[in-house]
Amino acid sequence: MVIDTSALVAMLSDEPDAERFEAAVEADHIRLMSTASYLETALVIEARFGEPGGRELDLWLHRAAVDLVAVHADQADAARAAYRTYGKGRHRAGLNYGDCFSYGLAKISGQPLLFKGEDFQHTDIATVALP
């Protein structure tokens, strides 16, 4: 699976559906995250919880054995195409900059996307069904 910022923020913020996201992560042995999404997640978490939140993020990623995938040209191209098709102001999915990197990694890896919200369900990307 590819983990989007929205899912990881839900888990680290202990939102009501956090356990469902955690169960989905535990059920899949492939756990990928774009380094662009990692930065986006760190910015959100540290804005909410300060540097201790950032340390908790890094610890969570380590314990969950999430593979941070560097942004290369193929991921960037897929992200760019996602914005062209599904970007905010262009399509009802309304993908933002960070969303496009999650989409791009899911597209090039062939892995389903774990996310919170309704944006990605309006795209052609495979998604993770929550337990």
From Swiss-Prot:
Record Pfam families: PIN (PF01850)
Function: Toxic component of a type II toxin-antitoxin (TA) system. An RNase. Upon expression in M.smegmatis inhibits colony formation. Its toxic effect is neutralized by coexpression with cognate antitoxin VapB30.
Amino acids binding Mg(2+): D4, D99
Stated family: Belongs to the PINc/VapC protein family.
EC nos: 3.1.-.-
Any GO BP: negative regulation of growth
Keywords recorded for this protein, A-Z: Hydrolase, Magnesium, Metal-binding, Nuclease, Toxin-antitoxin system
Statement: the UniProt record of this protein carries the keyword Hydrolase: yes
InterPro entries: PIN-like_dom_sf (IPR029060), PIN_dom (IPR002716), Type_II_TA_system_RNase (IPR050556), VapC_family (IPR022907)
Listed cofactors: Mg(2+)
Domain PINc: 1-129
Protein name: Ribonuclease VapC30
GO MF annotations, alphabetized: magnesium ion binding; RNA nuclease activity
Taxonomic lineage: Bacteria, Bacillati, Actinomycetota, Actinomycetes, Mycobacteriales
